Design a protein with these regions (language model features):
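Polar, low-complexity tracts enriched in small residues
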Residues: 1-254
């Protein structure tokens, strides 16, 4: 008796409590022949200005996104109107790498800096990609890309935390059997259904690019309507409705 029960909430932002969320689609460029051509193909995905109309109980506002914008730019545009709309945006670019055979892998990697970094790593077993992970982390100061091994070490998960596009190009291994396989991931770590196999023979199909993901979140219901078919929510201009992400469990301790 006479005990005081104190209840606390450790997080109050809309991405952690029950919220209305809307994510962009996972997208990557089909294998191209060079780093430069993969970058060109990436830019062509969003080659037009695309304004996004946000509607909700707060009213109607427009996030203006320029042609060629990456996920970071899109998130910034939504956050510029978040004070009025109540819809906040975060951006993240993620992908997973695996290899088909042991070899010395060499490839270019571009993220935050527009100057690609050179990655070289010797892999002696497809079940241990530590060398690729270490080589990517060694240039993270330039790319803003961090790398971590999967639990079984057979994969490397890369993250560009600011939402810059990631370009992986000009893969060479000196072998037609040793390829680099890249798969885009969403914010929650779910792999895209399409994996990009980059040929290691140094001729064609050795480059790709990963588009970042944007997550919109608000405590109130809302819709988003893209103003152009070439947009990061998919090739459509239909109105999109945010899904309600409810709180799954509450734990009380005394």
């Amino acid at each position: 008796s006479n005990q005081v029960l104190r209840l606390g909430v450790s997080a109050t932002d809309s991405t952690k409590l029950g919220a209305y969320q809307l994510d962009t689609v996972d997208e990557s460029v089909a294998p191209d022949d060079t780093h430069a051509s993969a970058k060109t193909a990436l830019n062509a995905l969003f080659d037009a200005t695309a304004d996004y109309v946000v509607k909700g109980t707060f009213g109607t506002f427009t996030a203006s996104v320029d042609a060629g914008a990456d996920a970071r730019d899109v998130a910034s545009s939504f956050n510029l109107i978040s004070g009025n709309s109540g819809v906040q945006a975060t951006a993240l670019t993620r992908a997973k790498m695996t290899v088909s055979a042991a070899a010395t892998f060499s490839f270019t990697l571009e993220g935050k800096s527009t100057t690609p970094s050179q990655i070289t790593a010797t892999i002696t077993s497809t079940t241990d990609l530590t060398a690729i992970k270490d080589a990517i982390n060694a240039v993270s100061g330039s790319t803003g890309i961090s790398a971590a091994l999967t639990s079984d070490k057979s994969g490397v998960e890369i993250t560009q935390a600011e939402g810059y596009d990631v370009i992986i190009g000009d893969v060479t291994t000196g072998s037609t059997d040793a390829n680099l396989v890249v798969t885009a991931m969403d914010m929650d770590g779910t792999l895209d259904s399409t994996a990009r196999t980059l040929d290691g023979d140094g001729t064609t199909g050795d480059s790709t690019a990963i588009v970042g993901t944007v997550r919109l979140s608000s405590q109130n219901a809302y819709t988003v309507t893209p103003g152009h078919a070439n947009n990061i929510f998919g090739a459509d201009t239909s109105e999109l409705t945010a899904s309600h992400n409810t709180i799954s469990s509450v734990s009380l301790t005394t």
